[in-house]
Amino acid sequence: NDLLIVDGHNSHGTHVAGTVAAVNNNGIGVSGLAGGDAKNGIKGVGLLSCQIFQHNPNDPQKDLGGDGAVAIKWAADNGAVISQNSWGYTYETAEEQAAATIPGHLRDAIDYFIENAGMDKTGKTQVGPMKGGVVIFAAGNDTREHDPIGKYEPVICVGSIAPDFTRAYYSNYGDWVDIAAPGGSSKYSQGDVLSTLPGNSYGYMQ
């Protein structure tokens, strides 16, 4: 029953969704990395949005966490073959984070997704675009050398780089990070990433 606490007021999930899947070449807003090509009738990726956070009545700026493991398993059973996660656990100190390990129920859910995504209920017949799934997690934004989820070997862990192609000042880091991508940086006057926000709007975030 680990408690997830995240900044809930910044619409991070919607922003990431636009970065991944906003429709390309439709003359509207921004273009996603896998948004297809509207002009040429090429369909982009589809998204399954899994809400795992709950409203916190005591602090509207913070959400209470649900169970990300349940969401990952549900996604595998409902057609997803890539699980993109930019959430994680929070720790009061670097020492507490360094001692942390991935919770067993989350590890099991990740393993389940990798093994069963794209397959039928028997696990023997491929029904999706690929046999088995890929699980991606953000490295985290604590400027620390450890993240228990990112360090789990089957996970593809993504760090963040700034506009000058150095590590973003907030990104966690270490040899367990598999790849890095532009994540924005508020330390630069024009360093944040433009993407979608709730309410048919757009905004810059890091």
Where are these regions (language model features)?
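Structural detector of well-ordered beta-strand residues that form the stable sheet scaffold
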Residues: 48, 114, 134-136, 180, ...
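Catalytic-core regions built around general acid/base machinery
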Residues: 98-134, 151-154
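Alpha-helix termini
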Residues: 27-31, 35-40, 112-131, 184-187
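Active-site glycine-centered loops adjacent to acidic/histidine catalytic or metal-binding residues
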Residues: 140
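Extracellular S/T/G-rich loop segment that most often corresponds to the catalytic His/Ser-adjacent loop
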Residues: 1, 147-206
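Subtilisin-like peptidase catalytic core
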Residues: 2-112, 159-162
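Proline-centered loop/turn at the N-terminus of a beta-strand
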Residues: 46, 81, 132-136, 156, ...
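Extracellular/periplasmic catalytic domains that process cell-envelope and extracellular macromolecules
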Residues: 10, 39-43, 75-78, 127-131, ...
